[in-house]
Amino acid sequence: TAHPLAFLSGWTAAALISAALIFVEMRARSLRHHSGLADAMVQQAAEQFLPSGIAGLLLAVMLWKFAPETLWLLPGLWQVLVSLGIFASARLLPRSVALVGAWYFIAGFTVLILGSADHTLSPWTMGVPFVIGQSLMAALLHIASEDTDAEP
C-alpha cells in the first residue's frame, strides 16, 4: 500500500476492536465456567499475552519512524508475535488452541518469505492469515465450550 500510516492505523483499530471482543467473550466464558476465579483467570491470560502485543506496537512505531522501508516486514512479524502470545497464554486455554499458535507462527514466516520478493506492504498479508487464524480460534473455542457444557 502507498499509505503506510493508513495501513498501521487501520490494523491497529482492527486489533483493538478484536482485543475488546476477545476480552468480553473471555470474561463471559470464564464467569460461566469458573465463576469465583473469573477475574484472576482473565487477568492472568491478559498478562501473558500483553508482552507480545506491546512488542508488536513498539515494532510498528519504531519501523515507521526509523526504517519505513522495512514496514513490509510488519504483517509477518505481527503474526509471529501473535503466535508467541497464544503459546504464552495456552495453559489457560483449551489444548487445541496451540494449533492456532502454530498457524500464526507458520503464516508469519510464510508472509515474510513471500514479502521479501517485492517488499510491498499488502493488506492481504494481514487479512487472509488473520481471518483464517481467528476463524480457527473461534471454531476450536466453540468446540471446547460444547465439550465443557456437555460434562455433568
Region spans (language model):
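C-terminal ends of transmembrane helices
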Residues: 21-40, 84-92, 135-142
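Terminal transmembrane helical module of multi-pass membrane proteins
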Residues: 88-152
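Selected alpha-helical membrane-embedding segments in polytopic membrane proteins
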Residues: 1-58
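Membrane-interfacial segments
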Residues: 29-33, 66-67, 144-149
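Hydrophobic alpha-helical transmembrane segments
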Residues: 1, 18-27, 52, 69-81, ...
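Helix-coil boundary and interhelical linker segments in multi-pass alpha-helical membrane proteins
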Residues: 1-8, 61-73, 114-122
